[in-house]
Amino acid sequence: MSIYKALTIAGSDSGGGAGIQADIKTFQELDVFGMSAITAVTAQNTLGVHGVHPLTVETLRQQIDAVAEDLRPDAVKTGMLWNADMIEEVARKIDEYGFNRVIVDPVMIAKGGASLLRDESVATLKELLIPRSYAITPNVPEAETLTGMTISSLDDRKKAAEQLVKMGAQHVIIKGGHQPEDNHITDLLFDGSMFMQITHPYINTKHTHGTGCTFAAALTAQTAKGDSIHQAFEVAANFVREAVENTLGIGSGHGPTNHFAFKRNSLNTSR
C-alpha cells in the first residue's frame, strides 16, 4: 500500500482549530501521513490570538531538513510564515529539495483580526513564494493585498486570479467565504487557461475558525495523492463545506470547524 505524505510549514494553534493542528487533522482524515515544521507558537482560542512567539530561522531549517532528508513529502503546504527571513528560508528549501507540489496559503490575518504576517513581508512572499507555488489559495482580502486590486465581484476575482498567475503561480484558488452572493458562496479556480467554479449555500455560523488552513490542507493532501488540481479543488471545497455544516459548537467565540465530518458526515457531539 502506498503511503502518501504531506508536510505543513506553519504556526501552531493552541486552540486546535487552525495552523498545523488543523492541517494534520485534515491530512489524517484524507488518508495522508502528515508532518510539520513549526514557524511560531501561538497562544489562541476561539476568542482570539493572545500571543505569537516566532521560532528562529535555524529551528525552522532543522525541522524542514529532518523531514525532507528522511521522509520526503509528496506535497508541501505553507501557512503562517510570520516574517521575510522565514519566507526566504522556505524558498531556499523548496529549491534545495526540489519540492514541486507546494500549496501556498498566504496567511495574513487571524479570524479575530490579529496579524500573522509582518507587513514588510508581503513583498517577499510575492517575490519568492508565489513563483514557486503549485497553487496559491488566498481569500478575498489576501488576494486584494497580493494584487493591489479592489475585489467586489466574481469578475474581479477572475481578474485577480489572472494577475496572480502572471506573478508566477501555476494555479490560483480565490475562496468566496468573504463574498457571499444570493446566500451562496462561490470558490474560484484558475488553472492558467480556464476557470472552474464551485458554488454552495452560505452557512450563517460564527464557527469558521481555521477554514482557510483546512481548505489548503485538503488541497495539499489530494495533491500528495496525485489528484489533478481540479480534482483536489473539488475535494477541498467539499471537505470544508462538510466541516462547517457539521460544526462542533465548542468555545465562546469563533469556534473551529469539524475536521471529522467529511468521512463521518457528522460527529455526535453529545458523547
From Swiss-Prot:
Pathway the protein contributes to: Cofactor biosynthesis; thiamine diphosphate biosynthesis; 4-amino-2-methyl-5-diphosphomethylpyrimidine from 5-amino-1-(5-phospho-D-ribosyl)imidazole: step 2/3; Cofactor biosynthesis; thiamine diphosphate biosynthesis; 4-amino-2-methyl-5-diphosphomethylpyrimidine from 5-amino-1-(5-phospho-D-ribosyl)imidazole: step 3/3
Family matches, as CDD domains: HMPP_kinase (cd01169)
Reactions accelerated catalytically: 4-amino-5-hydroxymethyl-2-methylpyrimidine + ATP = 4-amino-2-methyl-5-(phosphooxymethyl)pyrimidine + ADP + H(+); 4-amino-2-methyl-5-(phosphooxymethyl)pyrimidine + ATP = 4-amino-2-methyl-5-(diphosphooxymethyl)pyrimidine + ADP
BP-aspect Gene Ontology terms: thiamine biosynthetic process; thiamine diphosphate biosynthetic process
Binding site for 4-amino-5-hydroxymethyl-2-methylpyrimidine: Q44
Keywords, sorted A to Z: ATP-binding, Kinase, Nucleotide-binding, Thiamine biosynthesis, Transferase
GO molecular function (one): hydroxymethylpyrimidine kinase activity
Family (UniProt): Belongs to the ThiD family.
Protein name as it appears in the record: Hydroxymethylpyrimidine/phosphomethylpyrimidine kinase
Lineage: Bacteria, Bacillati, Bacillota, Bacilli, Bacillales
Gene name of the encoded protein: thiD
